[in-house]
């Protein structure tokens, strides 16, 4: 299990962008497709405290928000410990 989890759907272009961002930095992540699994949708609602947009990204157990928040966390050095 990775320290990063990306909640996504198959039709979300920003989800693709977020995953590519993590891939480029060599940061492993688990993807949870909420459009394919009802249980994943329930988990998404709880973990993200009712967020209605994807992607939603969890780092070290804390939901940080979407792609913008991911890039801000990276700029602040908050992802450094996850990079190889």
Q: Could you say what each language-model-derived stretch is?
A:
Residues 1-28:
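Local sequence-structure signature of Cys/Sec-based thiol-disulfide redox active-site neighborhoods
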Residues 13, 39, 52, 65:
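Short alpha-helical
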Residues 49-58, 68:
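Structural micro-motif
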Residues 59-84:
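Non-catalytic, surface beta->alpha helical segment in thiol-disulfide oxidoreductase systems
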């Amino acid at each position: 299990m990775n320290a990063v989890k990306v909640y996504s759907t198959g039709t979300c272009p920003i989800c693709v962008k977020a995953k590519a961002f993590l891939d480029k930095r060599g940061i492993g992540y688990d993807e949870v497709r909420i459009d394919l699994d009802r249980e994943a949708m329930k988990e998404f609602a709880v973990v993200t405290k009712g967020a209605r947009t994807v992607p939603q990204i969890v780092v070290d157990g804390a939901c940080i928000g979407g792609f913008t928040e991911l890039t801000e966390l990276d700029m602040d050095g908050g992802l450094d410990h996850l990079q190889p």
